[in-house]
Each structure stands twice: as C-alpha cells, then as structure tokens.
UniProtKB/Swiss-Prot annotation:
It is found in: Cytoplasm, Nucleoid. Residues 99-108 have a biased composition (Pro residues). This is Nucleoid-associated protein HEAR1046. Gene3D superfamilies: Nucleoid-associated protein YbaB-like domain. Pfam families: YbaB_DNA_bd. SUPFAM superfamilies: YbaB-like. Keywords: Cytoplasm, DNA-binding. GO terms for molecular function: DNA binding. Its main location: cytoplasm. Residues 86-108 are annotated as: Disordered. It comes from Herminiimonas arsenicoxydans. Signal peptide: none annotated.
Amino acid sequence: MMKNQLAGLMKQAQAMQDNMKKMQEQLALIEVEGQSGAGLVKIVMSCKNDVKRVSIDPSLLADDKDMLEDLVAAAFNDAVRKAEATSQEKMAGATAGMPMPPGFKMPF
C-alpha cells in the first residue's frame, strides 16, 4: 500500500513540475504595468521581471531630476509588485492538489 502512495506522490510531483515549467513560459509573455505620479511615469514589464517599456510624460522632463528618479523607482516597484502577484496567482494553479507546508513560497 505504501509503495502505491509513493508512486502516486511521485507522479503528482512530476505533473506539478511539468505544469510549473509551462506556467513559467507563459509568465514570460504576460505583461503588467506599474505607474507613479498619477500615470505620468509608466513601466511595462513581463512577469519574469523583464522591463519592456518605460514611458515618461514630457511635462516631467523639465522638472526636478530627483523627483523624476523617485517616480521611475516608484513605477518600477509598482510593476514588480504586480508581476509578483500575477505570478503567485498563476502558479497557485500549478501546485493545486500538492500538499505544501504553511507559508511555503515558490522561488519565482
């Protein structure tokens, strides 16, 4: 009986690994947009944290350099948070049915 349970668990783990690989490939195609300054600075990145585009409203280019740098950093951080949330949500389906320890966080 124990041998069958182990075989089932191994099969489940292999399926989860396959699902996670497919999901990671899909995450590279999903884009999220981070914003700051009420949309004056926007950063588009993939859920694999590859920055695709940076948009800065022309009105900010004549302004304070420090403020612009802060807005870019804030937009980047917003995009990273959105990418992480999307990744966690999508990967939750890949691990469905597998017993995971409480608070376990996947490395992606």
